[in-house]
Structure formats: C-alpha cells, structure tokens
C-alpha cells in the first residue's frame, strides 16, 4: 500500500473518469454562458466572518462543517463552503453593482465542508454555480431555474425532479417565525434543538434526524402564510416555469441549509442517489448584499453538484465526456524516427488530431501493443530506411493494412483517413 493517500472524503478524478468530470462541469454551465453569464474566479479561502454573517451562524455549515484556521498573521480564514457569499463580496468590492443590472456571473470549482464522507457527500465537493444580482423580478428567478434544468438535460440526465417553494419575505417571515416557535416549544425537543429553535426555528425543520422529522411533521407551513407580495412573486415564477416547460413539484416543507434564502427556493432531486438525493439547489437572497455591506439589492442563484451529477448519470447507466484516447499513434524505430514523428505529431495536433507517441525503447512489438491499447485508428510507423526513402508507414489499426506514404503527404492522408 502506498505511503500517501488522498485525505478522507477528498476524491481524485483520474482517466477515464476525469473526462466525464470535465464534461459534466462544463456542460452544467453551457446554458448559463448562452444566457450572458460571465465567469468569475473566486478565492479558495475567505475571511471567516464573511461566511458567519452571510451563510448564518445557526446553520450546520457554519457551526459544524467549515474548515477554519488562523493563518500566520493570526487572521481567521475559512476554506469556502459555498459560493454565493464570495460572489456577493466580489460584486461589492469591485463595484459591479454600480453598472448594468442584473450582474450575471457563473463559477466552478472545489468547496469544502467537514462532513461524514459517504457516496455523494465529500469533504471537498465540486460545484458549479450561477448568481444574478440586482433585479427583483420573478422572471429572472425562472430564468435561473431553467438554466439549471437545461444544464442537467444537456448531459442526458432525465431522472430528476425540481422541487420548489417560497420562504416568504420580510413581511410574513417574522409572523411565521413566532408561529413556528410556538409550535416547536410545545415539543419534547433536546436542549440543543431547542436552542436552535430559539435562534432560527427554520433550522429545526432542516434537521435530518428521523425522530425530529417525525415531531415536526405537523409544523405550520410557511407557504400557507405568505404575504400578498410574496405569494404574487411565487405564482409568477410558477407561471414562467410553465411557459418555459420546466416541470416542477411544489414542496411546502422544503428548507434549504443556508440562512440567506428568501422567496423562491428550489432543489433538484434524483432518487437514484439514495439518502444524498439532492444534486443541486438554490434560491433568492434579497437581504444578503446589504447584510454584507453593499447596496440593498436582491439576488438569486444556484449551486449544482458535479460529483453528485456524475453519480446520477451512473445510476441511469449514462456516460458523457470524450476520453483521452488518441486518433493516431506514432511508432518510431530509431532516434531519427522520433524526430520525424514528433514533427508530424505537431502538425497533426495543430489540425485538431489527437496524437500520441511511443517513448522509450519498446521495440516494434511493444510499440505496436501500445498503439493497440491507445485506441488509435491509425499508426505511423517509420525507421531510418523510411526516412532515407522520404516515406512513413501509415497503418489502419482496424484492418491491419499498411501503406507507405510520402512524408510530405502524411498529414493530409491521415486527416482523410479519419474523415476530418
């Protein structure tokens, strides 16, 4: 066994799985880029206070799951557990909110949460995300949701469902909070859960323990207590989703794990993943920007799990991504032949052809075995005699047929054989 291994809960992606990883990561954001969302690259770590204030101190993310440490300057920093707070911080810091609105941004990368590792739940999780900041418009909510839906479908995934609800606004949330606390304080909850109920009662509804879920099954539902404005907003979002033909299921008991969500809140679920069924989600966060020191502007966004989407595709028996296999494999039979084939490989690669070469002293048989394993359709075989004659052997690895081709014509001949 090797002396060093990846840390627990931190997956490696190596070929051929890495090809699917890249395809999923990029595919999930294809619809966003077509809708005018520009790329933003965020720091891997931020000031701890950004997440404590933005995500919410009562959340499991902040209280239990963050990787937080003091740097050499004794500053408290945290590996990013999610993307929205960092995006909002960047929008404020760089004055993007002073330009055209909404600010449309997308991102991809690793995020970090200290969780109990299991299939689909990692301590380093790969996500893509989208944020639209500056406009409070239900049509924008629908656009963001439709982009996520299109991202999954572009990969061929179809066994998922969109669950959606509204978490209300500043008008109805305080009244509902009192109603929910009254209900919760009437239950036989443990001390820690009662503390959470006092601090933020919605967090209790997000508790995954079966005994707590059973006790809160009859809790009042926020969707039944929406203000007129929040209800109108939600109804309009649903109308737009209907027009866009994005199917959804209303889940009145949905509670997302982050405190900044308001109004529209949604999650994409795939039952093929077992307990870790969520493959992405998001919502509106109308007070977050002001809370982080910026203008009082609204926003909406989502985060989609690359790791979990890969597992969902596997559950459906589907695969995406172009493998690293090459089209052409070069077999040099001498040192001079290595130079000749290196030049031809460069010319073919410049034309979009994937080329690999045999390195080391494998001999003809060993090099041809490597060519067969490479998955290439064509092998280029040459030695000193071929170089003197100004030719290269071009072998069809499917039929075994080999012909001598003028060195100057090899590139065109190979491209023709590949049907390019």
Curated annotation (Swiss-Prot):
TM ranges: none
Main location: cytoplasm
Keyword Phosphoprotein attributed: no
Localization per Swiss-Prot or TrEMBL: Cytoplasm
InterPro entries according to UniProt: aa-tRNA-synth_II, aa-tRNA-synth_II/BPL/LPL, Anticodon-bd, Anticodon-bd_dom_sf, His-tRNA-ligase, HisRS-like_core, HisRS/HisZ, HisRS_anticodon
Catalysed conversion reaction: tRNA(His) + L-histidine + ATP = L-histidyl-tRNA(His) + AMP + diphosphate + H(+)
EC number: 6.1.1.21
Catalytic class of the enzyme: ligase
One example GO MF annotation: ATP binding
Keyword Cell wall biogenesis/degradation: no
Listed GO CC annotations: cytoplasm
Keywords: Aminoacyl-tRNA synthetase, ATP-binding, Cytoplasm, Ligase, Nucleotide-binding, Protein biosynthesis
Assembly, per entry: Homodimer.
UniProt name for this protein: Histidine--tRNA ligase
Organism whose genome encodes this protein: Mycobacterium ulcerans (strain Agy99)
Gene: hisS
């Amino acid at each position: 066994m090797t002396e060093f291994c990846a840390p627990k809960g931190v997956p490696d992606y190596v070929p051929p799985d890495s090809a699917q990883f890249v395809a999923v990561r990029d595919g999930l954001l294809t619809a966003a880029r077509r809708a005018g969302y520009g790329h933003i690259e965020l720091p891997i770590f931020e000031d701890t206070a950004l997440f404590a204030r933005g995500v919410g101190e009562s959340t499991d993310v902040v209280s239990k799951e963050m990787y937080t440490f003091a740097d050499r300057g004794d500053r408290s920093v945290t590996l990013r557990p999610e993307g929205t707070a960092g995006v909002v911080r960047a929008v404020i810091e760089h004055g993007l909110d002073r330009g055209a609105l909404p600010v449309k941004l997308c991102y991809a990368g690793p995020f970090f949460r200290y969780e109990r590792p299991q299939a689909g739940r990692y301590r380093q999780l790969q996500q893509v995300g989208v944020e639209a900041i500056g406009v409070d418009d239900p049509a924008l909510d629908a656009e963001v949701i439709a982009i996520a839906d299109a991202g999954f479908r572009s990969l061929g995934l179809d066994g998922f469902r969109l669950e959606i609800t509204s978490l209300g606004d500043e008008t109805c949330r305080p009244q509902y909070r009192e109603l929910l606390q009254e209900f919760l304080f009437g239950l036989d909850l443990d001390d820690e859960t009662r503390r959470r109920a006092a601090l933020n009662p919605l967090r209790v509804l997000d508790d995954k323990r079966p005994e707590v879920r059973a006790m809160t099954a009859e809790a009042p539902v926020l969707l039944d207590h929406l203000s007129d404005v929040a209800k109108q907003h939600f109804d309009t979002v649903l109308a737009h989703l209907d027009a866009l033909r994005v199917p959804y299921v209303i889940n009145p008991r949905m509670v997302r794990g982050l405190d900044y969500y308001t109004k529209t809140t949604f999650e994409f679920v795939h039952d093929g993943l077992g307990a870790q069924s969520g493959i992405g989600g998001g919502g509106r966060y109308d007070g977050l920007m002001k809370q982080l020191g910026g203008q009082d502007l609204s926003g909406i966004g989502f985060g989609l799990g690359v790791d979990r989407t890969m597992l969902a595709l596997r559950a459906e028996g589907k695969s995406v991504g172009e493998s690293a296999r090459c089209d052409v494999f070069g077999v040099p039979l001498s040192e001079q032949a290595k130079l000749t084939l290196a030049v031809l490989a460069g010319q073919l690669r410049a034309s979009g052809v994937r080329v690999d070469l045999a390195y080391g002293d494998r001999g003809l048989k060993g090099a041809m075995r490597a060519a067969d394993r490479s998955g290439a359709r064509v092998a280029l075989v040459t030695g000193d005699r071929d170089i003197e004659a100004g030719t290269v052997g071009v072998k069809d690895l499917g039929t075994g047929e080999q012909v001598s081709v003028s060195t100057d014509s090899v590139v065109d001949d190979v491209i023709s054989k590949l049907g390019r």
